[in-house]
A protein has these predicted regions:
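N-terminal beta-strand motif that seeds the catalytic metal site of vicinal oxygen chelate
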Residues: 1-14, 64, 115-117
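Short glycine-enriched loop/turn motifs at secondary-structure junctions
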Residues: 1-2, 57-61, 92-93
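Conserved short beta-strand elements that form part of the metal-binding/catalytic scaffold
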Residues: 27-60, 108-114
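Amphipathic alpha-helical segments
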Residues: 12-27
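Short aromatic/hydrophobic contact patches that present stacked aromatics
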Residues: 5-7, 38, 63-65, 98-100
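A short linear hydrophobic-aromatic micro-motif
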Residues: 26-27, 48, 85-90
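Vicinal oxygen chelate
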Residues: 78-79, 83-117
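Short, conserved charged micro-motifs
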Residues: 15-18, 72-76
Length: 117
């Protein structure tokens, strides 16, 4: 069994599509109707965006994570995000390097690198 996709309820599909395309390289895979789109990330995973009213507090109940090869890549992402006006926190728990940002609906999204071996 393979985890195939995650669906987010968002207030504006267009704004969320632009965010995930710009910052994480996702491209449109399916766009069947207004208010719904499926984006594909380079490794094949899917992110479905469905327009609606996100549940109160739902943005803080989970996060999305994108792995990059090195901690330098995490720092580069953080610096690029900050240069474009996003708040980007950096953490280093247990040898990980993690940069966290929020999407247009406040969902937490992290870019991380595994601890060096």
């Amino acid at each position: 069994m393979i985890l195939n996709h995650v669906q987010l309820v968002v207030t504006d599909v267009g704004a969320s599509r632009a965010f995930y395309s710009r910052w994480f390289g996702l491209t449109e895979a399916v766009h069947e109707e207004a208010g719904f789109v499926i984006l594909r990330e380079p490794a094949g995973g899917l992110l479905a965006l469905h327009e609606g009213r996100p549940a109160p507090g739902g943005a803080d109940s989970f996060h999305l994570g994108f792995q990059v090869p090195t901690s330098r890549d995490v720092l580069d992402f953080r610096d690029r995000a900050r240069a474009h006006g996003l708040e980007a926190a950096l953490e280093r728990p247990g040898g990980f390097a993690i940069a966290r940002v929020r999407d247009p609906d406040g969902h937490a999204v992290e870019v991380y690198a595994m601890p060096a071996a």
